């Protein structure tokens, strides 16, 4: 069946903020009083696509729940400070490609990121007008599959395709019962039995 719409993931699919996020996390760790661990871009890439609190929990598996919540707040504040000042790096051809695709399909955006982060991407990239609707974990507190389903329902989409770069994106598409296209320039590894671009 021919797709009637395209739903995009954000990080690793449309842009890369691993370098400024790593610097932000190191700033947040310093403010939190942790100087023994330095975060790299590779650390950030390894958890990109997970909800923010889960990203922190994966990188700091031994931290108490109480300290985890405080650390999440500290890292989020530092990340917001740096990302709002610097933005990220759009992948080559993304802006032009989205404009061209938007002339053929309704475009949507679903990410596991914080609400402010998605809003800032849309403002910073000047691509807000390209997307008809968008949703994030930070806005709903719900997993990516639920947010894909919400976009599908509220926009009356019959045959959307979710486009992402990780196995988590693929699994979310499966749960939401939508087709999936894997982009191989992001942070994930190839996914079997899907179209890879």
Label the model's feature ranges.
Residues 23, 31-63, 69, 92:
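Alpha-helical substrate-recognition element adjacent to the catalytic core
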Residues 24, 55, 93, 117-120, ...:
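Phosphate- and divalent-cation-binding pockets in alpha/beta enzyme and binding domains
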Residues 104-109, 158-160:
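Short active-site oxyanion
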Residues 57-95, 99:
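Metal-dependent phosphoesterase signature
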Residues 1-4, 66, 99, 115, ...:
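Asp-based, Mg2+/Mn2+-dependent phosphohydrolase catalytic module
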């Amino acid at each position: 069946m021919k797709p009637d719409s395209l739903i995009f993931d954000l990080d690793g699919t449309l842009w890369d903020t691993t370098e400024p996020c790593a610097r932000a996390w190191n700033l947040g760790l310093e403010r939190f009083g942790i100087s023994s661990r330095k975060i790299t871009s590779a650390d950030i890439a390894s958890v990109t696509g997970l909800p923010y609190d889960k990203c922190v929990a994966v990188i700091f598996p031994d931290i108490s729940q109480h300290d985890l919540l405080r650390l999440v707040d500290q890292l989020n504040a530092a990340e917001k400070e740096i990302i709002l000042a610097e933005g990220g790096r759009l992948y080559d051809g993304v802006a032009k490609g989205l404009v061209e695709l938007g002339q053929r399909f309704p475009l949507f955006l679903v990410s596991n990121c914080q609400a402010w982060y998605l809003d800032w991407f849309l403002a910073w990239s000047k691509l807000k007008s390209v997307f008809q609707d968008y949703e994030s974990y930070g806005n709903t507190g719900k997993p990516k599959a639920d947010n894909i389903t919400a976009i599908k329902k509220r926009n009356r989409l019959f045959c959307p395709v979710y486009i992402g770069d990780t196995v988590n994106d693929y699994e979310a598409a499966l749960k939401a019962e939508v087709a999936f296209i894997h982009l191989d320039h992001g942070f994930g590894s190839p996914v079997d039995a899907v179209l890879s671009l």
